[in-house]
Structure formats: structure tokens, C-alpha cells
Amino acid sequence: MRVLVQRVAHASVVVAGETIGKISRGLLLLVGVTHTDSQNDLEWMAKKILKLRIFEDDEGKMNRSVEDVGGAILAVSQFTLYGDARKGNRPSFLEAARPEQAQASYQDFVKMLKLLGSVPVETGQFAAHMEVSLLNDGPVTLMLESPTKEEK
């Protein structure tokens, strides 16, 4: 599982001209799922993101989590995080999970964020063409990847 985490002042997602998800201060998550992701990967990632200390404290140090600052999360599915453009000029998406698996995993991940966390969680629409708007705060952007079985 790969998640691109962006600290934002605000973010929103629009589908067919309608805003379907919107947050103020918090985290925009672009969420990618691969074939081998398990429930353990989803839970690990949800816990990591909820506790990730990338918001500044009173001394300007990254010492607070999204929960600590009363922020929110906007989670958007993004299969292109598994794009491989090492060969040729058109990316291959063979490492991305099939849509059925990816949708179920994405939905389970969002449920875990809501269950394990204490912050509002908004979402995009799976497999839709989305217009995602954000105002980066920092900018602070991190790419997280769940540990491989060897790393666990």
C-alpha cells in the first residue's frame, strides 16, 4: 500500500461539478493499493497516518499529529501511485490492484481511519474522474509505503 500524504490548509474533491469531499486544516491522502495488500497493511497505514507528527508545535517543531491539532482527513483513491514508467513513455499499472480488490481495500482503509481515529474523514469517489484542489501547508509531503513481509 502506498499513500502520498500532504499537509494542507484546505482541500476538496469535485466529481461532475459537485463537491463530494472537503476539509479545512488536515491531511490529503492519495491512496494506492497493490495486489499483496492485506488487512494488516491497511491497519498499519491507518495507525501510522493518524499518529504521524507532521504538524508544528508552539516551538515550530513537527511534533503534533492530525488528531493533536483537531484536523481532518480527505482520502482519495489513486491507482496511479503504482505506475511504473521505467520502460517506455507510457506507464504500466500492473502493480496496482484490480479495481474490485482496490475498491474494497480503499473502503476498508477509510473505515479503519474512522474507527481508529478521532478526526473527520472525507473521501473522493472510487474510479471517478475527480478534480482535487488543495492548498499545501509547508509544503509537507510524504510518501508512505506499508512494510514488506520481510520488513515486518
UniProtKB/Swiss-Prot annotation:
Keywords: Cytoplasm, Hydrolase, RNA-binding, tRNA-binding
Main location: cytoplasm
EC code: 3.1.1.96
Reactions catalysed: glycyl-tRNA(Ala) + H2O = tRNA(Ala) + glycine + H(+); a D-aminoacyl-tRNA + H2O = a tRNA + a D-alpha-amino acid + H(+)
Gene3D superfamilies: D-tyrosyl-tRNA(Tyr) deacylase
Molecular functions (GO terms): D-tyrosyl-tRNA(Tyr) deacylase activity; Gly-tRNA(Ala) deacylase activity; Ser(Gly)-tRNA(Ala) hydrolase activity; tRNA binding
One CC-aspect GO term: cytoplasm
Subcellular location: Cytoplasm
PANTHER family recorded: D-AMINOACYL-TRNA DEACYLASE 1, D-TYROSYL-TRNA TYR DEACYLASE
NCBIfam families with a match to the protein in the record: D-aminoacyl-tRNA deacylase
The protein's name: D-aminoacyl-tRNA deacylase
Native species: Chloroherpeton thalassium (strain ATCC 35110 / GB-78)
